[in-house]
Amino acid sequence: MKNPLANLMQQAQRFQETFQKTQEEIAATEIQAESGGGLVKIRMNGKREVLKVEIDPSLRQEEHEVLEDLIAAAFNDGVRRVAKLKQEKMAGLTGSLGIPPGFNLPF
C-alpha cells in the first residue's frame, strides 16, 4: 500500500510542474487590444508588458488629449484580456485541486 503522504507529495510536485508550465504559456502569449474602434492598438504579452503601440494616422495632433485617453483605454483593455486569459488557463489547474472557481491565487 502506498504511503498517503508520498502520494500527496507527488500530487503537489505534478501541480507545481503544471502550474509553472501554465505560467510560461501565459507569459509567452501575445494579446491585441484596441480602443476608439481600432484607432489605437496595443500588443502586449501575458506579463502585461506593452510590445507595440499603433496609432491610426487619421488622428491629428490637435487631438492629443483624445489620443492619451485612447492609449489608456487600449492598455486597460489589454490588461483585462491578460487577466481573462490567466483565469481561463488556471481554472482547470485549480479545479483539479478542489479550489473554487474565481478564487485568486496570490501568484
Curated annotation (Swiss-Prot):
Assembly and oligomerization: Homodimer.
Keywords: Cytoplasm, DNA-binding
HAMAP family registered for this protein in UniProt: DNA_YbaB_EbfC
Function of the molecule: Binds to DNA and alters its conformation. May be involved in regulation of gene expression, nucleoid organization and DNA protection.
Location(s) in or outside the cell: Cytoplasm, Nucleoid
Organism annotation: Methylococcus capsulatus (strain ATCC 33009 / NCIMB 11132 / Bath)
Covalent S-S links between cysteines: none
Annotated Gene Ontology cellular component terms: bacterial nucleoid; cytosol
Gene3D superfamilies: Nucleoid-associated protein YbaB-like domain
This protein's name: Nucleoid-associated protein MCA1327
